[in-house]
């Protein structure tokens, strides 16, 4: 979010307008914060915790993408690759939360089948709903009260910095967290 102070401001303004600055943010507030939800969806697309799906095992000889996959082969889906595939996403290298919004600013109800930050099918993350709600509450509370920026003299990190093995391991950063002055 250091790259996008305008989105930090948009989260703040949305929360200020639709929830307020005093009361505790609740799960029900998710419905009145489409911009925040779109920002979280785009963040999940670009920086999923897991780069690969959990393992799957083929039960029959099959093929995919022109490759033969014998029965009993362990298969991992490259979720990172899917989230950056230009055949699925317009300008996948760009942070574009607007891709998740309708023309009227409401959040799109249907998510594309190639959006898989929590995997899919029988191996989908069992805590997906809880994780999304916690991330919403943490994000809205944080940006309602603070702004985050790069530390002076520090190079702004790249959007794809970090090491992916089975999970994302972002590098350490020096940041500045500034308390907002509420008007």
Q: Which residues does each PLM region occupy?
A:
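Central I-helix of cytochrome P450 enzymes
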Residues: 1-16, 43, 70-78, 116-117, ...
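Cytochrome P450 heme-binding "Cys pocket" and the immediately downstream C-terminal segment
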Residues: 5-8, 12, 128-166
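Conserved cytochrome P450 K-helix E-x-x-R motif and the immediately C-terminal K′/meander segment
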Residues: 25-66
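Beta-strand cores of modular interaction/reader domains in eukaryotic scaffold and signaling proteins
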Residues: 34, 63, 68-70, 74-78, ...
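Conserved cytochrome P450 K-helix/beta-meander segment immediately N-terminal to the heme-binding cysteine loop
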Residues: 61, 77-106
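Cytochrome P450 heme-thiolate "Cys pocket" and heme-binding signature region
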Residues: 65, 102-135, 161-163
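C-terminal helix/juxtamembrane-tail motif
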Residues: 73-74, 80, 164-183
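Conserved beta-strand elements of beta-rich interaction domains across eukaryotes
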Residues: 74, 81-83, 122-123, 137, ...
């Amino acid at each position: 979010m250091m790259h996008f102070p305008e989105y930090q401001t948009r989260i703040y303004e949305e929360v200020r307008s639709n929830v307020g600055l005093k009361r505790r943010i609740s799960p029900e507030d998710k419905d009145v914060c489409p911009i925040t939800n779109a920002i979280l969806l785009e963040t999940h697309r670009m920086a999923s915790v897991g780069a690969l799906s959990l393992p799957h095992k083929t039960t029959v000889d099959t093929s995919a993408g022109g490759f033969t996959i014998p029965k009993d082969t362990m298969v991992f889906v490259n979720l990172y690759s899917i989230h950056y595939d230009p055949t699925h996403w317009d300008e996948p290298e760009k942070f574009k939360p607007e891709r998740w919004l309708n023309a009227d600013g409401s959040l799109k109800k249907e998510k594309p089948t190639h959006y898989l930050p929590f995997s899919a099918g029988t191996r989908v993350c069992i805590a997906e709903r809880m994780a999304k709600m916690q991330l919403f509450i943490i994000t809205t509370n944080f940006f309602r009260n603070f702004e985050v920026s790069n530390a002076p003299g520090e190079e702004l990190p790249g959007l794809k910095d970090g090491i992916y093995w089975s999970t994302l391991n972002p590098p350490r950063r020096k940041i500045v967290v500034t308390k907002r002055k509420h008007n």
